[in-house]
């Protein structure tokens, strides 16, 4: 088997994109757009039913597809539970957790925050109005 070329080796297996089908594009653009921008993503694509934001080679899409079969996402059912993002320092996680409520997010697991993922895992778990969860993970010790 031939050795992969440098570009393939650098990107093979990397996440290319994530597409979230949402019941309300305007609401999702407000919440996800704010969060992704805060995490360093930049607007990438825009069309009638969707938007995307890109960081490096990876992008996140929110789309209000006419093919939706339900108006609600339930992260506790089979399928996607949450997206986890490296969010910078603990101070960055704290700042995002505090600001999230102004942008369509609610802090989850408040009784265990910021250690809901365990004593060695500093993170904020947030959920938008449509039930999508994001985990904001501190990358400093």
Predicted regions and their residues:
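N-terminal beta-strand motif that seeds the catalytic metal site of vicinal oxygen chelate
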Residues: 1-29, 83, 140
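Vicinal oxygen chelate
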Residues: 2-11, 15-23, 73-99, 101-141
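Long, continuous compositionally biased terminal/linker segments
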Residues: 4-9, 55-88, 92-95
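Core segments of cupin and vicinal oxygen chelate
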Residues: 12, 19-64
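Short amphipathic alpha-helices in soluble, non-transmembrane regions
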Residues: 31-34, 96-101
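A generic structural signal for ordered secondary structure
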Residues: 52-55, 84, 90, 100-103, ...
């Amino acid at each position: 088997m031939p050795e992969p070329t440098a570009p393939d080796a650098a990107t093979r297996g990397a996440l290319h994109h994530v597409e979230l089908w949402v019941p309300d594009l305007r609401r999702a653009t407000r919440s996800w757009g704010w969060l992704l921008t805060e995490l360093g993503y930049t607007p990438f694509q825009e069309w009638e039913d969707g938007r995307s934001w890109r960081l490096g080679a990876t992008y996140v899409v929110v789309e209000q597809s006419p093919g939706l079969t339900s108006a609600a996402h339930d992260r506790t059912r089979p399928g996607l539970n949450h997206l986890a993002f490296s969010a910078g320092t603990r101070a960055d996680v704290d700042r995002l957790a505090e600001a999230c409520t102004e942008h369509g997010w609610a802090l989850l697991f408040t009784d265990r925050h910021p250690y809901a993922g365990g004593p060695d895992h500093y993170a904020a778990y947030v959920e938008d109005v449509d039930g999508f969860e994001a985990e904001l993970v501190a990358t400093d010790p």
